[in-house]
Each structure stands twice: as structure tokens, then as C-alpha cells.
Amino acid sequence: MSAHGTNEGALWGGRFESGPAAAMAALSKSTHFDWVLAPYDVRASQAHARVLHKAGLLGDEDLATMLDGLGRLAADVASGDFIPSESDEDVHGALERGLIDRVGPDVGGRLRAGRSRNDQVATLFRMWLRDAVRRVAEGVLDIVDALATQAAAHPSAVMPGKTHLQAAQPVLLAHHLLAHTHPLLRDVQRLRDFDVRAAVSPYGSGALAGSSLGLDPEAIAAELAFDSSAENSIDATSSRDFAAEAAFVLAMIGVDLSRMAEEVILWSTPEFGYITLADAWSTGSSIMPQKKNPDVSELTRGKSGRLIGNLTGLLATLKAQPLAYNRDLQEDKEPVFDSVAQLELLLPAITGLVATLEFHTDRMAELAPAGFTLATDIAEWLVRQGVPFRVAHEAAGACVRVAEARGAGLEDLTDEELAGVDPALTPDVREVLTVEGSIASRNARGGTAGIRVAEQLGGVRQLSESLREWCR
């Protein structure tokens, strides 16, 4: 069985007489996914070098040499001139090798003092995630803005609101579109809240027990744009609840987008006929020439399942791990990396889809009163006349039976038919027996009346802009 040298490409050795077996090395290897942390690793190493210098563990000349070498290494990583070798176990070992190649083993070998891969990777993961969630948040806000723009373009268009996918009450199309913005805005707020907890640096925690070399965790935390350093070194190196929290919010974004995607799929069918998809955001069939498929929406549904799976897998990895660090945590990054990558693919496509939707408002208006959607308006009109709601509810239901029996809408009932159901149903009830009257009457905060929807639109735009400030 072939073996590596005891320290080739790795940050450990010495007590071993031989390196790991080839299969063991392959199992341990993580450069194929953790290389995305390389720019953060170099930044953290630059900060660590300054902390070592401040503690008297690195002389002025060595500090200058090390920072110069790290700067050159950072440039080579960015350009692709420096990449991991086959023998490198992980991003940390690869970069130490790169530094030693540039400044020699005497200076390069000093950087490892006072830090462990345990506190190092926990810090880098947080740094990467804090940047990643801001990118995701901006993509989510692009969708919010596209929905708001469509809402503003259709201020008076009406449609049938549904519960249980059955006709319920008429609403404004703008009201419905804005209903999708609020969960997405909350998702961005969750990312912002997550960032508060992620902004705690594990650096200086060592393997688990902290440092004995007089290093300053607060100094390195400040340089790396953290709000503070960790209060407990064992917790800092072994906990990944920050990763699980991020994975949850990313999955929740997927769920919220999947719900919207499902409506796009339904609305684009001939049976609904509410929308036409732009050619740029549709695909065809290899055999059926007439097809125009809502693939963006279907892929959104599919990827939401993938995001949920990433969260579930991560939680399963984290359960039952005793304190402190365990190698299981090598499995913590790929699910989160993948969730971010999937959303970065998905969000621009959904933005383009939403921005180019063509709404058939005449079709929506035609269906708005169908299915007796004005029945609740009859009941509530009776309540305003002093009729108890239980009685009013039964009277409105009786009106539905009469209309259904003769294949008419509620608005088509005669004065005699209305009075025959309940004498309280005078001709004045007709003020709510129109879609426009029904919508205008729902003018409480949050309702579908035009004035309230305009308020909602303003609030959505204001909150979106405020959240963009955090992203920047």
C-alpha cells in the first residue's frame, strides 16, 4: 500500500512513522471544495502575522518578509497561478506550502504559531458566509424589486383570490404580487440577523483551549471585520450552528421562491390563462412543437428540494458530536457552499422571469367574480346593517344556492330573489355586488383596497432599499 511522507501536504506529522495510506489521504482531502476559502485564509494569515508581531513572536524584518510573501501568494491565488497540488490535504496546508515556497521555511514556518486548523477554518467559514449571504440577499432583493415594479405597473388590475386553490374573494393583482415580496424581505432580514451572530471571530481559540502565546483575539477580530472575538474557545471551535442557521435561511428562500414558482406554472396553463412567459425565460419540447415550458419555475421547485436536503444533511452531521472539534465537521461546508451556489444560479433567472411576465388582466377580471367570490361581501354588508354574522353567513350561502340553481352570478340576482332570501337584503346591497366595490371596501391596513396596496408598495420599496444598504 503506498503512503505519503509524514508531513507532505499536511499540517501534522512528527509522531507518525509514516504518512497516511492512499485511501486515507483521499478520504481526508478537501481542497476540491475548500479552496474557495483561500482568499480568506490569506487575509486571516496577514492579520495573524501582525498579531504575532505585536506579541513579540515575529520580528520586524520577518513580519515584512511574511506580509510580502502573503501578498504575492494572494495575487497568485487570485490569478490562478497558484493552485493546490495533489498532495495538499486542505486549503490551509496548500497555502502554507505556497508561503514557504515564497519566503522560505524559517519565516514561513513561523506563521502556524498560536493557531490551529480548528479555529482557523471556523473563522474562514464565517468570513466566507458573511460575504456569501450578502450576495444572496442582493439577488433576493432584485426579485422583490421586480415584483414591486410589476405591481406598480398594474395598480387596478383585479383577479380572483384563492384559498385551497378555490375561488375565494376578488383582490388586486398588485396586492397578490406584493404578498410574495414580504416573505422574501423577511428572508433577507433573517440573513441580516444571522450576520449578527456570525460576526464573532473564533480566531485565537486554538484547537480548543485557547492560546498561551499572548495573542490578541480582539485585534485579529477587528482586522477581519468581526464585531468581537469568541467568549468560549471550546464553543468557538466546535459549534456550527451559524452554518445551520444560514442553511435554514437559504432553504427558506428556496421554499418561498418555490411557492411563487408554482403559481407561475399554474397561471401559465391554458386553464388559468393569467400570464404569458417571455421566450427568453421558457423552453420548448423536443417532440411537441407547440410547447412553451416554464422551466425556470420548475427548476426553482426542484432546487428548493435540494436546499432543504442540504439543511437536513448538515443537521444530521452536527447531531451527537461531543465537544470539542470532530472531523465530522469536514462535512459542514459542502452543503452550505452548494446552497449558495444554487441560489446564485437561480436568483437572476427568477428576476428575469418576473420582470418579463405578461399579465392577461382581462382574463383575470373575467374570472374575478366567478365561483361566487362576492358571497363574503353580502354577509359583511348584512353585518353592517345590524344582522348577526351567523345569520348573515347563512343568508349569503342561501344567495349562492339561488344563483347556482339558475346558473347565474350573485351580481345577477334580482331584487326579488335577494329579498326572498332575507328581507334585509335591499337593493342597496348592490354597492358590494361588484368586484370593484368589493375591493374598495377592504380598506383596513393590509387590505386589498387600492389605497392600501399603494401604501404596501411604498413600504416594500422602502424596506428593500434599506436592506440593500446592509448588503453593501
From Swiss-Prot:
Pathway: Amino-acid biosynthesis; L-arginine biosynthesis; L-arginine from L-ornithine and carbamoyl phosphate: step 3/3. Its main location: cytoplasm. GO terms for cellular component: cytosol. It is an enzyme of class 4 (lyase). One of its GO terms (biological process) is L-arginine biosynthetic process. It is found in: Cytoplasm. Belongs to the lyase 1 family. Argininosuccinate lyase subfamily. PANTHER family: ARGININOSUCCINATE LYASE. This is Argininosuccinate lyase. It comes from Rhodococcus opacus (strain B4).
